[in-house]
């Protein structure tokens, strides 16, 4: 197995509606077949589109900064529901500890397990090794299994539609009104 090497590859999102390109699932499968033990997927930012990473990830780690506004928290709500761990980076800045406490409180109000919430400062190299140790031993929390399968189902369906050889023809038919959206889905979905 490959344990200590690092392979980095940037991928354009292309036709994907989420932050994770459709081809990434195939790349992960290939890397696992090539004996890579761990594959880390970095997404492009925050927001609801980030939940699509659940379609291909075994574990989800959300990295936050301190003093994030309520609007950003609302954007990340879906992603935080899927989180197996949360890291509040930049713990050297004001508000980091308070933000970590608020995250823990919000998790404790929910159902299921509370993921670990860790403080780190990459700048000052504080908490980074400890967080890495926790992440390496992170077991599947089970708190988001249904949500992950939902995202996998949606991503698979999206990929099936986008890769259909009939897509352009169906889009043309929709544009002129000769078929309904339900008919288009039936054709593209192979029903």
Positions of PLM-derived features:
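Nucleotide-state-sensitive switch-loop elements of NTP-binding domains
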Residues: 1-49, 53-56, 62
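Hydrophobic/aromatic beta-strand patches that form the interior of the parallel beta-sheet core
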Residues: 7-9, 59-61, 84-87, 118
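Conserved nucleotide-binding/hydrolysis micro-motifs of P-loop NTPases
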Residues: 13-16, 45-48, 66-70, 91-94, ...
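Conserved ATPase-coupling elements of RecA-like P-loop NTPase cores
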Residues: 20, 47-53, 71-74, 95-99
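Residue-level signature of catalytic and energy-coupling elements of molecular machines
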Residues: 24, 42, 79, 89, ...
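Short, conserved loop/helix-junction motifs that constitute active-site signature segments
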Residues: 55, 79-82
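Canonical P-loop GTPase G-domain recognition
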Residues: 82-85, 91-141
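Long, well-ordered amphipathic alpha-helical subdomains in the mid-to-C-terminal portions
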Residues: 119, 130-191
């Amino acid at each position: 197995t490959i344990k200590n090497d690092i392979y980095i590859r940037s991928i354009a999102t292309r036709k994907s509606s989420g932050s994770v390109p459709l081809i990434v699932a195939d790349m992960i499968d290939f890397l696992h077949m090539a004996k890579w033990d761990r594959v880390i997927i970095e997404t492009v930012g925050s927001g609801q589109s980030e939940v699509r990473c659940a379609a291909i990830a075994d574990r989800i780690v959300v990295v936050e900064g301190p003093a994030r506004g309520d609007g950003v928290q609302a954007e990340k709500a879906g992603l935080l529901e899927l989180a197996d761990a949360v890291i509040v980076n930049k713990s050297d800045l004001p508000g980091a500890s308070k933000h970590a406490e608020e995250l823990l409180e919000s998790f404790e109000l929910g159902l299921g397990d509370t993921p670990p919430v860790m403080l780190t400062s990459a700048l000052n190299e504080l908490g980074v090794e400890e967080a890495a140790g926790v992440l390496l031993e992170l077991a599947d929390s089970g708190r988001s299994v249904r949500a992950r399968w939902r995202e996998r189902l949606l991503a698979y369906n999206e990929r099936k539609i986008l890769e259909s050889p009939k897509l352009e023809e169906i889009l043309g038919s929709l544009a002129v009104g000769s078929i309904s959206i339900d008919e288009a889905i039936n054709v593209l979905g192979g029903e």
